[in-house]
Amino acid sequence: VFLYLLLLHFKLPVFYSVIISIGITFLSPQLARMPGHFSLSYVFAIPAMLYLIAKFDQRNRYCISVIIGLFVLWALGTHVYMLGFHASIIMLYWIFKFLYNKETCKNRKNYLHLAIQFIGPLIIFIAFTAFTDPVSDRTAYPWGFLFYRAYPESIFLPLGKPYAQFLLNFSDFKYINWEGIAFVGIVASIGFLIAIVFFIIYIAKNRLKSFPQPSEKYMMNVFFWASLIMLLYSFGIPFIIGDASQLIHYLGPLKQMRGIARFSWLFFYMINIFIFYHIWNLRKKGLNRVIWVILLVLTTSFLYYDAYINVRFWSKQVNNSIPALNDHQNRTDENMWLKEIDISNFQATIPIPYFHVGSENIWVNATCGITRPTYLVSWKTGLPTMGVMLSRTSISQTLENIELFNEPYRRPAILNKLIPGKSYLIVTIDDCIDIPPIQKKMIDKSIVLYQSDDFSLYECPWDSLVSVHNNPFYEILFEINEEELFAYGDYLTDHSVMNFQIESFSENSGDDYYIIPGSYSVRLQKGSWIYHKDIPNFEAGTEYIISFWVNDLRKDLFMRSRFELQLRDSLNQGHDAWKPELFRNVKAFDGNWALIERSFHFKNPGDIIRWHITNNDLRRTEYTVSHIMIRPSHTNIYRKGDGWLMKNNRFFMP
């Protein structure tokens, strides 16, 4: 409706406005958000703001400003990206107005209008969020700012369209994330190319003595240039130029809107309005009537064909019928499991394999298709789930959740926040092979309730959940006292030959260390390597494990640092390298310390290990390493301390 009204505002006839507005609506990239990010699929949101601003410019009424302000509040409560769209329209409108009309700057009423339209609603939203959000440690650096960006190809090329398969002969376009696709339509693409040609001719003739006006409509020009600015921003400009990516750190809260490709949507609407407006007005500029009619038919047909392809594709995604959910009375065979369990016995569901995505610091990705049965069981039972698939979750809460499903070490803090004595409902897939040992142990200690090819349900009693995290201190003490071990300095090993290396940094005594005094601090920048050579009784081809404790686990962005490990020969030439994110090698947590562990294979006698942790976004930040251990995977290393026992770099206390 608002597209139609906007076209009428620009003096296009009713029947043409109806036809074009329908075509643009069904071509909209916002339809792609119906299968997910549903609140971003409100196709009216951007055209409505364009229409309201156009009407405000025409009438300059406070009532329109109030409507705009209320609309911004609605946008803020719907999805924060809606604020981004509306803010870009409102603020760029006022910037153009202030720049090109000096009288506007002098009129104090205009500042009041701006306050009503945008500043006031924004302040209300910030205040409301500050008073209602109990979480204070969400990430300030969400991942993907330059990954979820648009490309000229994703905007102007008909990628994936039946008539453009030949484009795959030039590139597979795999570097384009689906978030970046906002095809404007073949008509708008060709029209924009022609507009660029005319723009170049204009510059050649006028040498930019006056600012180019794409149309005779002032507001269309304002919206066009505003949309073009946002298109460039969606490409990642200026951040993709040289080393300008560091500028992202100065964006403040704007960093939270990491899906910058979405800002190309404003351009999608405006370039289509702009092109079809000019096509209609070609007749007034002297184009032959027959040619004009043919052009109208062809361009409108192509618009509808592109729209049809878009709708046909996304309709299949939206029509995602799940029979089990459609059975509201739970009478079908696939919902019979509900009659076999007493929901009141459980406090939540636990998906195994466990998944937790959302903190932007640590990812535990879902495997074995566990998300579908997890959501299904949670939906049917009404039980909350401990599985997480969100964004901007609390970093501390994330660590508490993940700690429960990591290998046993310290008693998980989250156990003190759960309801003691009440069971958990485990949702799992029996033939999944990607289940970590501790989670397998949870299943082994649970009671089978239901099994099928799709998923299985187990009752995990409270005592069973707690027992998998029992302190192994006395088990390790038994191993030390009863097994045949060999002493090498302060350490004991079950191997008769010393074949491990310890770096405790004992010469660097200070307050910042883990259990054993000694640590090493260095900046998160390239070049600060830690070397290990002359491994005793080196065994080529044997699996080795390097482990160490590192501080700053809870610092935002730190666990996204890269742990770069290299193997180099005796001539210092590299032959193997790994560069995973730090969180992918975390084995245990303890306060602000994390145990990092990775396996590798030596290949040649005299191989040297070197490694460091880097983070371009935290390059001036120091990290602290404590107690590095390199050992063959078949060898266990022990040590007794004052009130603690160590096994394979894990320190246990009674």
Predicted features and spans:
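Periplasmic/ER-lumenal interhelical loops and adjacent helix-loop junctions
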Residues: 124-200, 606
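Extracellular carbohydrate recognition and processing domains
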Residues: 573-608, 618-620
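Membrane-helix boundary/interfacial segments in multi-pass membrane proteins
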Residues: 32-40, 151, 170-176, 180, ...
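Membrane-embedded helix bundles of polyisoprenyl
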Residues: 1-10, 15-57, 61-98, 117-125, ...
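Signature aromatic-anchored transmembrane alpha helix within multi-pass, membrane-resident enzymes
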Residues: 91, 118-119, 273, 279-308
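Perimembrane helix-loop-helix junctions
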Residues: 84-119, 199-209
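Extracytoplasmic
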Residues: 305-531, 539-541, 614-622, 630-638, ...
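Hydrophobic alpha-helical membrane-interfacial segments at the cytosolic entry of transmembrane helices
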Residues: 71, 105-131, 142-147, 222-227
